[in-house]
């Protein structure tokens, strides 16, 4: 456990972690302070940060399980203590850590008698199991059990579709909520017109990320949501100047796509994710909100497609041009192959 004393200050606004502890593999706690704030500011920031922590942070979870010879979700399998439904619930609770997007495949292949835990999940290197002791099922007989799993990074909670079960394949409720709880409190100090506030933020996470990482991501997401208002004002004040900046040479990623596929060796385009490049967080989040996760997704869009995206700017297109040319050796503005 780490603790620091909190002292009111009249200096520049600053934040720090005053308490940090790990209660278990799936329960991290952090306490942070931001000060000095003017009266009313602490509540404004505290409410926004708490909502972002609980609703805007992304997480990785198991979204589907497939196994042969399973009649329906509420059936039982001879030699297994739990029903299929109970196994699915246990899989839903498995805490995973991954920074990559797209669907990842994993599996469980064991022979009983055996007590199956998260340690028995065979997952790709990009996916880390936070707590390998989490219970999945108990095989009481010498039987084989093989389960194919799908893993996905997402945000929030979404109930499975009851119409999406077929041939032993069952969807699992998406619970991508790394932050288990978040609170904020306010401490006032000073007198009269000099009254100031200290904002305390408490964060509990499931171990897939630390409270500090959660606070950083929530803050970044809030900033990204507010940036369009700033640019809207700039564009209104400098309309003529901005008109000139809209004239980028037209291009299409598709112009180079065929040639790039022929010459590129090794990693498939579907395995090159945009978070592996050096895009700014603003540009990255704009692409992500439009379901552009891989280089293949990006190469399927033209300049016009990108400019139709919400909050997307000419500067973002320029940055994508530069990044793709730098990292993937594609000269998008050159007409000749």
UniProtKB/Swiss-Prot annotation:
Assigned EC number: 2.7.7.6
Protein location: Plastid, Chloroplast
Keyword Cell inner membrane: no
GO biological process, one term: DNA-templated transcription
Alpha C-terminal domain (alpha-CTD): annotated segments: 265-337
Cited Pfam families: RNA_pol_A_bac (PF01000), RNA_pol_A_CTD (PF03118), RNA_pol_L (PF01193)
Keyword Cell inner membrane: no
Top-rank taxon: Eukaryota
Region (Alpha N-terminal domain (alpha-NTD)) location: 1-233
One GO cellular component term: chloroplast
Family: Belongs to the RNA polymerase alpha chain family.
Role this protein plays: DNA-dependent RNA polymerase catalyzes the transcription of DNA into RNA using the four ribonucleoside triphosphates as substrates.
Quaternary organization: In plastids the minimal PEP RNA polymerase catalytic core is composed of four subunits: alpha, beta, beta', and beta''. When a (nuclear-encoded) sigma factor is associated with the core the holoenzyme is formed, which can initiate transcription.
Domain notes: The N-terminal domain is essential for RNAP assembly and basal transcription, whereas the C-terminal domain is involved in interaction with transcriptional regulators and with upstream promoter elements.
Name listed for the protein in its UniProt record: DNA-directed RNA polymerase subunit alpha
């Amino acid at each position: 456990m780490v603790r620091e004393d909190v002292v009111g200050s009249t200096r520049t606004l600053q934040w720090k972690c005053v308490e940090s502890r790990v209660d278990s593999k799936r329960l991290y706690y952090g306490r942070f302070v931001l000060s000095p704030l003017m009266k009313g500011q602490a509540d404004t920031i505290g409410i926004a940060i708490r909502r972002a922590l609980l609703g805007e942070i992304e997480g990785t979870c198991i979204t589907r399980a497939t196994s042969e010879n399973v009649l329906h979700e509420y059936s039982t399998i001879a030699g297994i203590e739990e029903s299929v439904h109970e196994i699915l619930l246990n899989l839903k609770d498995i805490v995973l850590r991954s920074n990559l997007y797209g669907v990842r495949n994993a599996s469980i292949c064991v022979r009983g008698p055996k007590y199956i835990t998260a340690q028995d999940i065979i997952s790709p290197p990009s996916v880390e199991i936070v707590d390998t002791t989490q219970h999945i099922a108990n095989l009481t007989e010498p039987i084989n059990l093989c389960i194919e799993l799908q893993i996905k990074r997402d945000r929030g909670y979404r109930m499975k579709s009851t119409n999406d079960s077929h041939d032993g394949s069952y969807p699992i409720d998406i619970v991508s909520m790394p932050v288990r709880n978040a609170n904020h409190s306010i401490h006032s100090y000073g007198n009269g017109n000099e009254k100031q506030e200290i904002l305390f933020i408490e964060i509990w996470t499931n171990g897939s990320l630390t409270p500090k990482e959660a606070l950083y991501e929530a803050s970044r997401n809030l900033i990204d949501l507010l940036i369009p208002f700033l640019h809207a004002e700039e564009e209104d004040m400098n309309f003529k100047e901005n008109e000139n900046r809209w004239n980028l040479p037209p291009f299409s990623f598709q112009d180079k796509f065929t040639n790039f596929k022929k010459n590129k060796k090794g990693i498939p385009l579907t395995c090159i994710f945009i978070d592996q490049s050096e895009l700014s967080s603003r540009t990255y989040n704009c692409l992500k909100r439009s379901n552009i996760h891989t280089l293949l997704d990006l190469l399927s869009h033209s300049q016009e497609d990108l400019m139709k995206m919400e909050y997307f700017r000419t500067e973002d297109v320029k940055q994508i041009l530069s990044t793709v040319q730098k990292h993937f050796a594609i000269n998008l503005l050159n007409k000749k192959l």
